[in-house]
């Protein structure tokens, strides 16, 4: 029972009375002048060119810097503040560009005709051509980050507010940098504080998520929603009247501090002026004008209702504040994670592990890599979920009709999700090699999974083969039939139908369920019920029909996802040992081969599985974003004449009607304001091709070449003092996959932007 009284003496723990150690590690500026100071070997400086690569590989590998887990954890904690500082500086730069160089006011006044821009190119060598006409007498580079739409949702109405945010973000960055230094050098937390996971969960749930959502709900209720109501009324041509004055322009909108005056805001939302008496008397219906449950999209802006968003964040806040009181800390009540896990037994037939989840709490609490792995897997999955919500339920005003921004945000969150999930596999592998102690995991669920790994991997391999041959086979069949002039024998909506009946059922229950649930919304997202919302003559959202083409490409998605998982899971389950290399754990997380004399043992390290999974992740997500791009252009935005259903059922159709037809804009971009995307398209192809040099050739080839070049230098008496050394096998693969991914991503970036900017 997890709410049992505390063990004798449990309340007497003094961790919180002294959670930090004072002055544990004084600042040593001499170290900063010595690259690789954490390693006696690296700190001696370079003898060969391998030194710089080892420096990169180990700079952030705190495990190898010191054998002290507490010290490594403190470095991670301090680095988090550094990361937050970088984020605040990045945010400040965005705010500053918005305040100083953008056309935000012009866009805010006419968001359906003016395009967002936040950068103007200086006419130094004639590149001012890149400044396109974005409307309202502004020439600049069109942006697709969605910040203008987000700022409007926040309630920002002028550049002065953006400049204040820019200054505030820089101040926050300085505070974060100070905090990072302070909590490593002056007052560093003790290991007991890091290990107090119940306190951590309570504070993260109630503080970060609960109070964070409550604060945002407060801002949305008092500033965001009233400002949005005034702006929406202006855009709809029926401005509101406050204190007898018509709010006809943005300049007429009250300042944020004025909106906190009940007398003013009560004319927009009477519920906001009704006082707190209704709250304490449980007459919450009085607040239903600014805490709504409308559902669907605002027809003026094509986005979610701001009052729905405020209600959502208030509900989230309540949930997480309650959740933040769930775990047992000082008061002897609540859950203990260790007790929950130690007591948990799996199904006796499916998961007959005699010791259940015993040992998992300690493994998760002590292994930073295990924690990071789980967090990356969850956050990566969440990012992919977000990418779908961004277009189906567009949260920011007018973002749904900024097609490049919709496509860009979908693509961005997909890439982030994929990288995080591969990162989860990487750190799970590191955890198995460095942190897993088999003696502590005898017959628990982790041990049983490792013992069943052959069955798991062989079955997963069979699933991959089945999905691959069948899904690809459908395309081969269709290409063959179309090539032979037999459309009646193709899998298509007009011939042999393969309808995605389960997906269609899920779509239907979204709309049929309205009015039958406990929380009765007034509508449902247009993505499900087939209605069309147009804003400024452009489709913001309409029903998305699914057919044979979607079923076929979805099975390609399933195939590629399963292969990515197969590679990652094999890398984790065989990280410590395999039949081929029983002592793999002693070789570490990354190694090229199992030494000389053991042929056929290369590319078996856990790191190499991550390397291979990155390619599959990249290919998988390329098909996902291509599917999304073409589907939206064809069936929602009305840009390609609805050709997806008939063209996407053959490989030739994908090559001809998607890649080739839609590359017209980037290939003919020279001489236009989008010409930089043409240059980027070529340059990124070069970076991608450059990667193949590292991926296709071995270390010996290059070392042999270097020996010849060094000989020539010696003859001329210009030999380098640092000996040239070919990249190691692992280093070469790392450089190769990095350029492969960067080149591929930047190529796609240029392709998408030129396409949607080019057709306006």
UniProtKB/Swiss-Prot annotation:
- Write down the chemical reaction(s) this protein catalyses: reduced [plastocyanin] + hnu + oxidized [2Fe-2S]-[ferredoxin] = oxidized [plastocyanin] + reduced [2Fe-2S]-[ferredoxin]
Q: Describe the family membership recorded for this protein in Swiss-Prot or TrEMBL.
A: Belongs to the PsaA/PsaB family.
Q: Keywords in UniProt for this one?
A: 4Fe-4S, Chlorophyll, Chromophore, Electron transport, Iron, Iron-sulfur, Magnesium, Membrane, Metal-binding, Oxidoreductase, Photosynthesis, Photosystem I, Thylakoid, Transmembrane, Transmembrane helix, Transport
Keyword Iron-sulfur set for record:
yes
- The organism is Prochlorococcus marinus (strain MIT 9515)
What EC identifiers does the entry list? 1.97.1.12
Q: How is the cofactor bound, in the record's words?
A: PSI electron transfer chain: 5 divinyl chlorophyll a, 1 divinyl chlorophyll a', 2 phylloquinones and 3 4Fe-4S clusters. PSI core antenna: 90 divinyl chlorophyll a, 22 carotenoids, 3 phospholipids and 1 galactolipid. P700 is a divinyl chlorophyll a/divinyl chlorophyll a' dimer, A0 is one or more divinyl chlorophyll a, A1 is one or both phylloquinones and FX is a shared 4Fe-4S iron-sulfur center.
- Describe the task this protein carries out: PsaA and PsaB bind P700, the primary electron donor of photosystem I (PSI), as well as the electron acceptors A0, A1 and FX. PSI is a plastocyanin/cytochrome c6-ferredoxin oxidoreductase, converting photonic excitation into a charge separation, which transfers an electron from the donor P700 chlorophyll pair to the spectroscopically characterized acceptors A0, A1, FX, FA and FB in turn. Oxidized P700 is reduced on the lumenal side of the thylakoid membrane by plastocyanin or cytochrome c6.
In Gene Ontology terms, what is a biological process of this protein?
A: photosynthesis
Q: Which residues bind divinyl chlorophyll a?
A: 693, 701
Name of this protein: Photosystem I P700 chlorophyll a apoprotein A1
The record's NCBIfam families line, in alphabetical order, gives: psaA (TIGR01335)
List of residues binding [4Fe-4S] cluster: 593, 602
PANTHER family attached to this UniProt entry: OUTER MEMBRANE PROTEIN, OMPA-RELATED (PTHR30128), PHOTOSYSTEM I P700 CHLOROPHYLL A APOPROTEIN A1-RELATED (PTHR30128:SF19)
The protein's topology relative to the membrane is: Multi-pass membrane protein
**Transmembrane portions of the chain:** 76-99, 162-185, 201-225, 309-327, 368-391, 407-433, 455-477, 551-569, 609-630, 674-696, 734-754
Top EC class, one word:
oxidoreductase
Q: What InterPro entries is this protein classified in?
A: PSI_PsaA, PSI_PsaA/B, PSI_PsaA/B_CS, PSI_PsaA/B_sf
Q: What is its main location?
A: membrane
Per the record, the gene is psaA
Which parts of the sequence are annotated with region: Disordered? Answer: 1-22
Q: Name one GO molecular function term.
A: chlorophyll binding
Instruction: Give the CC-aspect GO terms.
Output: photosystem I; plasma membrane-derived thylakoid membrane
Residues noted as binding divinylchlorophyll a' in the record, renumbered to the chain: 685
Any idea where this protein resides?
Answer: Cellular thylakoid membrane
**UniProt feature, compositional bias: Basic and acidic residues:** 8-22
List residues binding phylloquinone.
702
Keyword check for Signal, yes or no. no
